[in-house]
Amino acid sequence: MKLSARILATALVLVLAVGAVSAQANWKPNKPITIIVPWGAGGSTDQITRVCAAELEAALGTKIVIVNQPGASGSVGTKNALDAPKDGYTWTAGAAADLATYKVQGMLDTDIRKDWHIFLSVANVSVVGVNAMTPYKDFSELLAAFKSKPGQVTVATAGQSSAGHIGIELIRKYTGIEYKHVTYDGGNPAVIACVSGETEMTTQLAVEQADMIRGKKIRPLAVMSDKALNLDGYGEIPPITKWIKDFKTGPNYFGIFIPAGVPKNVIDTVERAWKNVIMKSAKVQDYAKARGAMFAPSYGKEAQDRAFSYYQPVAWLYWDAGKAKVSPDTVGIPKP
């Protein structure tokens, strides 16, 4: 009898322990989650974050509020998320490359590998798009204009660290061109500037230019890839390697970033939601297909590895171009 009682007591302790672990693993938010989008409304980060947030609300059982806080190439909103209480209720979003440029440009002392839990959703590509009224019919004509009037062709981007700025800097790296940089508080305003004629061109992402391309307000000359881009409602956009044979760039991964230091059960719960909802989401897939993005959700180590694969070369692109204040190798980013 004594032995049976002891066994029963041990079993009861185990049941209670398992229950406690289960309770700790299941985070149930009791107030809305805020995602700080550190760019303007309507841009690439804003678009995909709103799609993912709507999908996650049901899985997490709470409202998710998107707050746009543009400024200093996204570093202001990102810092606000990083400095917020580590209770799991304040996240941010963006491209992995943003975090690389903040570090080497001295904008924000943050490291993607130590300071953030990364949840990726899509990968984006930049497009060389020109105002439909410009005379440039293909990329070779635009390149000739860059060379015949150095520093005069106007390029709209969302500012330092943005996908558009990375794109034009890559063209500069491979061709030696100079350009006149005109910056805006987000990809959408940059695209609108190109459409209105404030600038001749933009190198923002396909997802930001898609509607204007379909509406024939922007003429796409090349996609920054070694493969053509088939955009729904438009057709094929040729790869930039047709003109710049050795051009290389990787996919620009976008997602949601949760600061390190939040309770483990927050991350465990969001990872389960990402696996069960975002990685199977028809709405995220539809978004990617319609706007020229690649459906590429991941989390954990896989997301960290993917993010670093673009973060690393971008950090060195800025350093080699003389547009960084901090050498990447001094902050643990080896040359690829």
Predicted features along the sequence, with ranges:
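N-terminal (or domain-start) structured segment
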Residues: 24-114, 152, 160, 176-205, ...
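Hinge/capping helix and adjacent helix->loop/strand transition within the periplasmic-binding protein
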Residues: 30, 56-58, 80-90, 102-189, ...
